[in-house]
């Protein structure tokens, strides 16, 4: 980055926060390193905390090798979750608050214990999970629509908080099991040309395996920023099904089998 690193990071973070607030998060094409991108994300976190937003957890993104290839990275990324972007099942949201709304159906966990850098075995991670929750993650999809065609967009993705725009959570279930999981995602868009529901069915061990893999990766990665996952935090663990761009108005429903369901409306 040109100029004073501190000035450049702060100025860039201010601009990206303004883009987030105005729902104009798009792919800018700026050339940052991964380290610079995470520095910008940390400054964004400081700014959001200063205006009263509370950190409630983290998200892991780019868990799929396909998405990693599209954005030009060979590992996942992480973003932060804030109390201002958490809603409960059944909520109706204004689609205008998202820059090209897109959704993912996935599993999240709520932690009942802190995790340190050595706490990455399956058994330790499972003991730290208080509950498993089906969620609908909301994204600024306009960014990804361009990023996945240009490639090498990972640093901009990281700096923009992994284009996370909030999440809707279901009730979930206590604990965690590695038993084969299920996610059925349906989107109903009354004004879409087809006007037929879109469905994605994902069934298999990878649905639950990604939870532990993502949590282990996050626990190690956060050490670089002197952070760690803490009891009480929510961790979005990455989606096995692909991200779905949606048109508004629409109804989104995710069925996670024994773990319950979650639904929302975008108006």
Tell me what each language-model feature is.
Residues 2-210, 245-247, 251, 259-267:
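Catalytic-core "active-site belt" of small-molecule-metabolizing enzymes
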Residues 211-247:
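A conserved acidic, glycine/proline-rich C-terminal tail/linker
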Residues 228, 252-253:
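Hydrophobic, well-ordered secondary-structure scaffolds
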């Amino acid at each position: 980055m040109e100029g004073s690193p501190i000035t450049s990071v702060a100025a860039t973070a201010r601009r990206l926060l303004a883009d987030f607030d105005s729902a104009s998060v798009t792919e800018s094409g700026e050339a940052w390193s991964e380290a610079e991108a995470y520095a910008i994300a940390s400054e964004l976190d400081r700014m959001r905390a200063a205006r009263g937003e509370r950190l409630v957890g983290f998200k892991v993104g780019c868990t799929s090798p396909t998405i990693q290839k599209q954005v030009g990275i060979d590992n996942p990324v992480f973003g932060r979750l804030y109390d201002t972007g958490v809603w409960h099942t059944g909520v109706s949201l204004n689609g205008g608050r998202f820059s090209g709304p897109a959704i993912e159906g996935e599993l999240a966990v709520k932690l009942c214990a802190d995790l340190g850098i050595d706490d990455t075995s399956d058994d330790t991670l499972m003991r730290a999970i208080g509950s498993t929750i089906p969620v609908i993650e909301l994204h600024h999809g306009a960014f990804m629509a361009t990023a996945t065609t240009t490639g090498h967009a990972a640093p901009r993705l990281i700096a923009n908080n992994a284009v996370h725009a909030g999440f809707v959570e279901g009730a979930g279930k206590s604990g965690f099991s590695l038993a084969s999981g299920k996610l059925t995602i349906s989107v109903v868009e009354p004004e879409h040309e087809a006007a037929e529901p879109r469905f994605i069915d994902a069934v298999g061990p990878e649905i639950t395996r990604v939870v532990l893999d993502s949590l282990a990766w996050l626990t190690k990665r956060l050490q670089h920023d002197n952070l760690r996952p803490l009891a009480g935090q929510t961790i979005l663990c990455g989606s096995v099904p692909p991200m779905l761009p949606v048109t508004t108005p629409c109804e989104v429903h995710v069925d996670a089998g024994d773990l319950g369901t979650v639904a929302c409306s975008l108006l």
